């Protein structure tokens, strides 16, 4: 009788694992919390203690770089401070994909959509149709630019 109870208990223990749902706690994280108002938390992907914090830089320029749509994007810079509430600084180098030639000095564009997740950012621009995806490693940021078939491919 005792062995039957132990066997039944072990079977129940192992079967309980098959009924458990795989829940990622990172799905509950919203990187936009604290990004507006005086918080100025940056929304881009980053690694814990990572050297780079890439994110879009919008016009007008808040400290964190990002503003909600429909504000236009000037480009993407590699270093942002988060939660300081001060003015923009650090002279970041801007990266901006464009597909309409080199005849303009600025290639500012509005976002068609935007997805912000923990460790990942993507947007597509309205005028150019270029999709930008960003993720990071501890010491580098990675970009993927997807251009429309018939456009020039410039950065």
Give, region by region, the residue ranges found by the protein language model:
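Bacterial N-terminal signal peptides that target proteins for export
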Residues: 1-7
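Enriched but not universal
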Residues: 2, 20-21
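N-terminal signal peptide c-region/cleavage motif recognized by signal peptidases
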Residues: 15-16
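Accessory carbohydrate-recognition regions in carbohydrate-active enzymes
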Residues: 21-155
């Amino acid at each position: 009788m005792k062995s039957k109870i132990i066997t039944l208990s072990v079977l129940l223990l192992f079967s309980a694992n098959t009924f458990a749902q795989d829940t990622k706690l990172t799905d509950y994280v919203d990187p936009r919390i604290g990004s507006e108002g005086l918080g100025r938390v940056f929304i881009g992907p980053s690694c814990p203690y990572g050297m780079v914090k890439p994110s879009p830089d919008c016009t007008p320029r808040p400290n964190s770089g990002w503003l909600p749509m429909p504000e236009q994007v000037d480009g993407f810079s590699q270093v942002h401070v988060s939660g300081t509430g001060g003015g923009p600084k650090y002279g970041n180098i801007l990266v901006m994909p464009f597909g309409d030639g080199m005849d303009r000095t600025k290639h500012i564009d509005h976002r068609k959509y935007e997805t912000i997740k923990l460790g990942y950012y993507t947007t597509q621009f309205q005028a150019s149709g270029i999709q930008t995806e960003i993720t990071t490693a501890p010491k580098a940021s990675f970009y993927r630019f997807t251009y429309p078939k018939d456009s020039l491919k410039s950065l």
